[in-house]
């Protein structure tokens, strides 16, 4: 009796991810892998091949979509499809979206709604999907179905009879206002209810404000949202209700809509975990990403150095990485650094101080490096190897007969004013950080050969919304709880441009230097 109860409990606790992984194993054992084979139309019309974990995630999705009935989840096929892809930052979630757009187009869907909580994410994603001339465009130059060219268009309002792929890109604020504030040439809720939609929700952890608060409130329709509306206010006003009830389920009417969410950070709140037990289709966290060898290791360097010395210490690492990249023949390599201040005013002051320091830097300014090693704690922890990393850089200087004057000259050449940006716009008069469009463009193609940026000054731009994947160092320019600062030797990225690089040299660069 006890055994029966235990098996029943395990079945009740089973997640969709558990089920689909078990099902995949069974199909593989039965040599029925054709069941989850990727459609030729999808693979042929993407610019890049899939990484192993992307292919696995799509296979999981296909197993779910092609299975008509799930015994462990008897109601799941009686409601609109709602799935979540839980994948680490840098693992290629946008590539997954592109593949799923093609998949659903082949199934007959024509209207796609991409939404997120920040305008700058909307802007950078548009280019990935709709501009064939953009460096990060994810489809082939022409999407072909047989001999027919399939157009892909950015739209503000959907046409009822589209001959191609239509994507509406929007933020939470704009979607809310479109639905509840009727204006000419704007999408209304009635318009959306007349269509079959595939909704792509990026940074999906913002969908769970009401679940975390155990409250499913109705939208307050009296107040229009704008750029000044706080994130908390946006989420409080029913982001979750709007997407799930009004759009996905068409306010209780029959619906064939699809909601696909993407996030690297699903809240650990018990209610949220329960909500997604039958929705998570893949899990690929930072730990797994590191183990695959396609992202940078993360190391924490703590010290009691003053602000200027902390900056110069980071510049040592940047120079060292540059030298290692030259050694291994990695072209157009830029070890971009981010300097984080506590307030906007402090960030402006730190930015100006940095420009002054690098303009006037001398070899003698780096002399502290030979005496301060004792102030760093050595550690066996791979994430806390500041002393070891510094020793490696200094040994490299000695072994290769470099001097600090070479380091100073390199800094002067590579960190001029046009190589450094501050994320807060010079025209911004508000108390919150606001970036102008030109700076956003630079932030979102840091890896481009013609992008000159090597250093970024910011207050709170470590959250989602721009391409943090290209960072190699995050340097805190204010005191922490222990009274000192820290340099996090960081970086998280899966870059298509390095697919053909020799894997050992790519790994060596970061395992040695970060």
Curated annotation (Swiss-Prot):
It comes from Haemophilus influenzae (strain ATCC 51907 / DSM 11121 / KW20 / Rd). Transmembrane segments: none annotated. InterPro entries: Helicase/UvrB_N, Helicase_ATP-bd, P-loop_NTPase. GO terms for biological process: DNA restriction-modification system. Its cofactor is Mg(2+); S-adenosyl-L-methionine. Has a helicase-type domain in its N-terminus and an endonuclease-type domain in its C-terminus. SUPFAM superfamilies: P-loop containing nucleoside triphosphate hydrolases. It catalyses: Endonucleolytic cleavage of DNA to give specific double-stranded fragments with terminal 5'-phosphates. This is Probable type III restriction-modification enzyme HindVIP Res subunit. Its EC number is 3.1.21.5.
């Amino acid at each position: 009796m006890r055994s029966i109860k235990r098996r029943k409990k395990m079945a009740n606790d089973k997640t969709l991810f558990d089920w689909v992984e078990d099902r995949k194993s069974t199909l593989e054992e039965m040599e029925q892998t054709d069941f989850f084979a990727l459609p030729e139309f999808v693979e042929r019309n993407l610019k890049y091949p899939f990484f192993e974990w992307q292919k696995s995630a799509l296979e999981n999705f296909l197993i779910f979509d092609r299975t008509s009935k799930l015994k462990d989840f008897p109601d799941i096929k009686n409601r609109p499809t709602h799935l979540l892809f839980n994948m680490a930052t840098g693992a290629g979630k946008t590539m997954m979206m592109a593949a799923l757009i093609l998949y659903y187009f082949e199934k007959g869907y024509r209207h796609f709604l991409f939404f997120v909580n920040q305008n700058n994410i909307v802007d950078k994603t548009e280019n990935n999907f709709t501009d064939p001339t953009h460096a990060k465009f994810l489809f082939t130059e022409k999407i072909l179905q047989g001999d027919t060219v399939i157009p892909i268009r950015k739209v503000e309002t959907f046409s009822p009879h589209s001959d191609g792929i239509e994507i509406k890109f929007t933020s939470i604020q704009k979607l809310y206002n479109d639905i509840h504030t009727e204006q000419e040439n704007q999408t209304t809720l009635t318009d959306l209810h007349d269509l079959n939609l595939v909704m792509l929700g990026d940074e999906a952890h913002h969908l769970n404000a009401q679940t975390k608060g155990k409250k499913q409130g109705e939208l307050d329709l009296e107040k229009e949202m704008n750029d000044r509306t706080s994130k908390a206010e946006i989420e409080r006003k029913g982001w979750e209700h709007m997407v799930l009830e009004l759009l996905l389920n068409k306010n209780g009417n029959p619906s064939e809509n699809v909601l696909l969410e993407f996030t690297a950070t699903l809240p650990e709140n018990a209610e949220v975990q329960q909500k997604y037990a039958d929705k998570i289709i893949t899990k690929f966290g930072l730990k797994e990403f590191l183990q695959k060898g396609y992202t940078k290791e993360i190391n924490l360097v703590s010290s009691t150095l003053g602000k200027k010395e902390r900056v110069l210490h980071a510049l040592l690492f940047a120079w060292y990485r540059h030298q290692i990249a030259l050694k291994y023949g990695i072209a157009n390599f830029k070890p971009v650094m981010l300097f984080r201040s506590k307030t906007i005013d402090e960030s402006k002051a730190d930015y100006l101080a940095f420009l002054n320091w690098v303009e006037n830097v001398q070899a003698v300014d780096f002399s502290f490096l030979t005496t301060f090693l004792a102030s760093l704690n050595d550690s066996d922890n791979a994430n806390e190897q500041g002393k070891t990393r510094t020793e490696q850089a200094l040994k490299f200087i000695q072994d290769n007969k470099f001097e600090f004057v070479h380091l100073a000259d390199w800094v002067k050449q590579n960190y001029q004013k046009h190589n450094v940006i501050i994320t807060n716009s010079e025209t911004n008069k508000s108390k919150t950080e606001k970036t102008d469009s030109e700076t956003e463009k630079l932030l979102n193609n840091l890896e481009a050969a013609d992008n000159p940026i090597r250093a970024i000054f910011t207050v709170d731009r470590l959250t989602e919304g721009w391409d943090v994947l290209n960072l190699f160092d995050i340097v805190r320019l204010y005191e922490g709880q222990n009274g000192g600062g820290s340099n996090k030797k960081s970086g998280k990225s899966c870059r298509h441009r390095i697919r053909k690089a020799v894997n050992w040299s790519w790994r060596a660069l970061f395992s040695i230097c970060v």
